[in-house]
Regions:
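Basic polyanion-binding and macromolecular-assembly surfaces
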Residues: 1-154
Length: 154
């Protein structure tokens, strides 16, 4: 299994916010009544796309990776942020997983053609996207061979 780095669909603009800690956490803080200032960089909204690959040939020959393992992997990817919330990341979620399954172990079609068949486009009436619904995700199935199964999961 290989997953490439995710890239944002549209340019993102990071913002820096100032935070102040007023909670007293040590006895020394209580004596001095100190507060602490800090900064945090945030991205108000970003939709990212990542692409990944699984080699059925290597799975069979080397790792023993099975169909059951594959289903568990899909479940883990779809829920990976649900069990690891963090103030540092804000509200992150996997919105959709589009999976291509070939009929042949070495593939029916080059991966780039399958990835090119997935279009993520900002809706025309949206200038600054702030939610997933500001985008339309289209899989152009006419560009995908009949021997490749397309599965959309969310």
């Amino acid at each position: 299994m290989q997953i490439g780095f995710a890239r944002s669909i549209d340019p993102i603009i990071s913002q820096e916010v100032t935070i102040t800690r007023v909670a007293i956490t040590t006895e020394k803080d209580a004596e001095n009544k100190n507060t602490e200032m800090g900064r945090k960089t945030i991205v108000p909204y970003g939709l990212y796309r990542a692409e990944g690959y699984i080699s059925a040939n290597l799975a069979r020959k080397v790792t023993g990776f099975s169909e059951d393992d594959l289903e568990l992997l899909w479940e883990a990817i779809l829920n990976m942020f649900e069990v690891d919330h963090s103030a540092a990341r804000g509200n992150m979620a996997v919105r959709e997983l589009i999976v291509f399954k070939h009929s042949k172990e070495l593939g029916d079609c080059p991966a780039y053609k399958l990835f090119d068949a997935v279009e993520v486009k900002k809706n025309e009436d949206v200038e600054y996207p702030r939610k997933y619904q500001d985008y339309t995700v289209t899989v152009h199935e006419e560009q995908i061979p009949d021997s490749v199964e397309v599965r959309r999961m969310n």
